[in-house]
Amino acid sequence: LALDKAQAHTGLRPNPADFSVVAQSCGQSGCHAGHADPSRNHLEQVTRSLQATYAGGIALVRYTFGAQKDLSPYFGIVGAVDPQPLPQTVPALAPFAVTSASLSAEAQFARNCLAGGCHLTEPAADQPYRYRATGCAACHVLYSDDGLYTGADPTTPRDELGHPARHQLTTAIPFSQCNHCHNRGNYSLRGMTFTLRPDLPPVGALLPATMPPEGRRLREYYQPIGQFTQCEWKLDCIDCHTQAEAMGDGHLWPDQKTMQYMQCRTCHGTLTEPPATAKITDPNDPALRLARLNGHYALGVGDEVVVTERGEKLGSIQQRNGQLIQFGKVDGREYVVPLVQGSQCQQQPDQQESRFCHQCHAYER
């Protein structure tokens, strides 16, 4: 114990969720690691995820500039090993480092894109709309766009930038938290630089506080150059992307395209088939635990829910009175999920990916 502030905090880590110490905090056995149920071993999952390794991005840059012979990933921002790889994943990644033998493009990539970037090991830039923590807290501890504290702790200055909005963890992660990394701008592979969006801070002006919520959401959610369906900006990111997609599933995937599996057809089905569903029969089903932790939707044994192509139960999308109802994981709002089957959709059997749906269902800003 000490009365001096600096002495009292000696040896403490401001963010115990940072990957440098997470094995001694969140990842202790019996907490988020060491379980017989692999879905609860979040330490292994997230440290091997693409958000931690950026394996595909590193491979693309090195291949483009001739530093490796193919697009196979050999390096990650952090090194990692998967003792039980799948046929489409890799067994290990070496840590990416710039050496005297590295190409100048690799050094530029590390300096301009990886350092101070959007990856779980790197602290965020101290700029509006980019504040966040590292490690697990990058997603599970929410920050305001202006980086100011709004909680009830009297010891935290309310005018000091860089604090989370509140000192608490959550699984109800809004799109605005995801936007502190995603949708911030565009990379130039040619120039090895990152160009921030011109329509939002820190380049553009702050959006007016009087802007209606839906208009503000659409403005912030996606970049002007993109095409997106209405459900993609009406819902939050976690309403579509599953835990395994966002946090990893314990395997070292080579790139986002190979890892990502949620498609429009997962929830909306096709012209010939409705979405796949399954009943919750096991009281220990991981979907029940996720619902309890989230708190914005109820789920129980006997409920019928949508299932992904990998067998992952989507507890927030439930069969109710002959309809599929989706419950928002951030606010609990209810949405009726429209089905392709029985509609006037012109979908072709060989065109089932989401990119084909965007051709007709894109929403113009």
Q: How should each PLM-predicted stretch be described?
A:
Residues 2-261, 266-355, 359-364:
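Extended surface/linker regions that mediate inter-domain or inter-protein docking
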